Amino acid sequence: MREGFEIVAVNYWKSVNNEIKRILLDFWNTFLLIHDSLDFADIVGFLNKMPNPGKIMYISLTKSNDSMKPHLKDLKSKIFIIDCVSSMIFETKASQDCQFEPTPASLNEMMELIEKYILVVKPDLIVIDSFSQFIDFSSVSMHKGKELHEFLDELKKKYARTPYRFLLLYDNVLSKDLVNLPFTSVDVILKYEILTRRKDRMDRF
C-alpha cells in the first residue's frame, strides 16, 4: 500500500467458467487474479484468505526476495521464492527457502522454470507474479495470444490431473479495459480491487 494511505474496502468481481461447486471445493487448476496493487502485503493478504493453500512456490518477476521478506512473517503458509529480479542487480546467494534465476523472456521460458523446480520444491500452489510481464490483456497481438493459449493449454495438459494448482497474478494498476481475458483457458478469473484513502484526509460529511 502507498505510504500515507489506508485500506477502506476490498472489492471482488468473479468470472467462473466451471461449476461453482468445483470452485467451492477448491478443485480448480488455473486461477487468474487481476489486482490493482503492487504491494506484496496485499498479495499476502489474499493468499491468507485462500483455504488450505499448502506449500507455495512463488515465482517473482517484479519483486526481490529482500523486498518481500518483511511481509513473509504474516503469511500463514510455507513459501519457497524464486526471485527473478535480484540476479540482474547484484550478486546473489541461494538459501533454503529462496532461489535466484534470470527473468524468463517468454512464457516458454516460464514453463521451463516451472518444470525445473516443481519436482524439487513439491509445492501445492504455484504463484506467478506477474503475468502482466508477458501479456497486456487490453491489447493482445495474434502472436502473444497464441503464445498465451499454448502456455495455458500446456499447464492443463501437464498438471490438470495433479495436485498442483496455479495462481496467475496480473497487475492492472493503470486500470486498463481488459477486453482480451482468457475466459475459456482458465478455471477462475477474479478481480481483486483495493480501495484506499489518505490517512490524514478529513471527512466532510
Annotate each predicted stretch with a short phrase.
Residues 2-66:
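Glycine-rich P-loop/Walker A and Walker A-like loops and their local beta1-loop-alpha1 context
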Residues 165-205:
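Phosphate-binding/switch region of NTP-binding enzymes
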Residues 22-26, 49-52, 116-121, 157-162, ...:
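Conserved catalytic network of the ASCE P-loop NTPase/AAA+ motor domain
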Residues 32, 125-129, 167:
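Structural motif
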Residues 137-141, 145-174:
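Substrate-engagement module of ASCE P-loop NTPases
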Residues 38-40, 64-65, 88, 132-143, ...:
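Short acidic, S/G/P-rich loop/turn micro-motifs used as interaction or catalytic elements
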Residues 43-49, 70-71, 178-181:
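A short acidic, amphipathic alpha-helical/loop segment
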Residues 54-135:
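Conserved inter-motif catalytic segment of the P-loop NTP-binding fold
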